[in-house]
Amino acid sequence: PIFYRFDDPELHYIIIGFHPPRMVGIFFPERKQVMSLMNHDHPIIRQGWDPDRIALSCVMLEELLQVNADAVDQYCASADSHRLVLTQAFRPNVGHQLREEFSLLWKLYTKTDCDAALLTGPFDVLELARQLPDTIPRESVTFDESEVPWPVNYFNAVVNRGLFLGRMGCRSHMPLEMQQALQAGFRTEHPEAFDEIQKKLKNCWPVVWLTLRGHNRKWIGEGFHLRRLAETVTAKYPKAGFILDGLPDVRESADEILASQATVIDFIGSRFTEAQACFHLADAYVMPYSNSCTLHMVNPRPGVVHGLKGWIPDEPFEPAATESPVMARVVHGVKCETGNESYDAWVTTCDYQ
């Protein structure tokens, strides 16, 4: 959240969150009360800041009611000495981090004289903080979620450290200069992996990146279908090469594809930053609608994104706004229930006809 302070009629903070319309709540320190706004089409967003609309449209946000009352009192009493920091990587989703946080942070820190400190959260799996200038004052926060949810820990980090948080939170275009800087940065971090894959793919064309997924949004029969795809492409383009990407839980599908006669490079289990570095070698891709789309955001190229209708766009789309758009094609799947309610509640198994 980013907290805006208003002294009249009552001291309160507007809490700006992670998803549109960004404003998700109002904190009243005197009452130790947090109210939330969850409607994307809320009249406050469309028509202004009428207090009556605020009062009529709020509901209690239970998690943040667990805030330490003494810490809040101390925070409010010492407001004049609070430090402004910009935040990054407090939300686990790296796609949101990249297109909604980092693009703005990069512009602020490289194109302006912004000297605010950077507070990095526990979810910087792309190590984006390292892609910003070394001169930035910075610190990091880790959370223990064993007792309370991370939003509460986040709020406690604010009050205990005496911070004003500025959280980047809008969809911002990704300049070509920034994309090129990220590409070069990832390759500099992983030169050995890049060189090894490049050597294995010498004289291969086209090179197709295949991202596998074994947990939610997985593709039933993924190994069989992608093996058939690799063999079909190879029949038409004998020098084609394929790079397999994914977490270790896709090993069974990966082995099925590796058993084909196609030229297939096993890159399963690589670090996310290694994948970003080596994605530069691909001419096209096939991947699920997931954090994998950050590969396209950093290094756009033609490809196919698959997922359930309603979860992904209906038409070709751009995962992040760029200066030179490259659209991702879309393939929709059909949800298949397993009959296991606890499994189906959090895993979407997709079957593509």
Question: Where would I find each of the regions flagged by the language model?
Answer:
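Catalytic donor nucleotide-activated moiety binding site of glycosyltransferases and closely related
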Residues: 119-131, 210-272
